[in-house]
């Protein structure tokens, strides 16, 4: 016994669409619409927790405070120089990249701990705000502060 095939007709085009073709076209349309809904660009960076495993240029707490990266030129040039400086870092993966925001993950060599490092370009003040924080543990023994200072030196040297 043959099952009836569902055929849908477009009233103007008189084209037959099978059920599977209609589902595929709907899926493609969904993918394109999801791509258009991009993640909003952050306007600030999260605060550091009360643990000594984080540094941030936006922190008012001296234990967590670190200077932002200063730049001259355009925000686009600053992002290019920043990515060039990050190439010198080992075990770094870019997670999110937008025009004025960059989020990377840095892994430790031995235990593979993950640290989140975020950069937010402030074109009004020619600064790159930075936050580097360990995801786990209480203290990072200054690893995040040293990482940001290494990135700062590489950023200054990058052309």
Walk through the language-model features, giving the residues of each.
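A composition/secondary-structure signal for short, hydrophobic, low-basic-content segments
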Residues: 5-6, 31
